[in-house]
Amino acid sequence: MTLESEIEGLWERYQEGLTAADAEPQVDRLIEEFLTALEAGEIRAAETVDGEWEANAWVKQGILCTFGLREITAHEYGDVTYNDVMGLLETDDLGERGTRNTPNGTVVRRGARLGSDVIMMSPSFVNIGANVGDGTLVDSCDTVGSCAQIGENVKLGANTLIGGVLEPVEGAPVVVEDDVSLGAGCRVTSGFVVGEGSVVGENTLLTPRIPVYDLVEEEILYGHLPPERRAFTRYVDSSVGDHDLFEGGAYKPAVVATH
């Protein structure tokens, strides 16, 4: 059996009521194999199919099984004792791969992958299922959520939030493609895709619910920013302004994209 088929079988059992208390030792061994494959980049929570990003549902099922079929235990991290169903990623090999993590607060959970020549500044957090590509900067106060796919040579500005998407399992995670620069304070959520080579201004919110006014192709987009764009926040008229409670009109955020 393949790892995929084994995880799918475990997911079926979990959906039928299997609990951490009932799980056999081989369940934990399977979950450990699964987490190790994620960390090695052998499997990923999403991949491109015919040029479009799609979730690997079975990988997200495996992550949910990890949470549901392992007992909470105490773990030590420096002088801190914390309680979780898994430990943190082993970082002994980071230096030999050219990856740096500064002290006092760079946290990478099991099941996440860090590429080579990555820089993680304190404090920052990378969650399970996330994939951070080679040469990427994760700056101070950044969060890379569960299953997020971050490309190579990406710059995540300080205080940037990359949202996690675990459920529904069919839902594609947030994707930031290669050579993207996100300014400080940006937030990318709910499966939004930031196209390769784009530069996004500080404090921009990218989410499928906010329209992207692409001035290059003169179209309004939802859920993705095309490659090689310069994007920033502006405000446009909102129909809410027609309500009597809003004297002088009302405005809603929008993203404007140019070359």
Sequence positions of predicted segments:
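Terminal amphipathic alpha-helical/low-complexity segments used for targeting or macromolecular assembly
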Residues: 1-99, 227-228, 233-259
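Structural signal for interior beta-strand "rungs" in well-ordered beta-sheet cores
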Residues: 95, 100-239
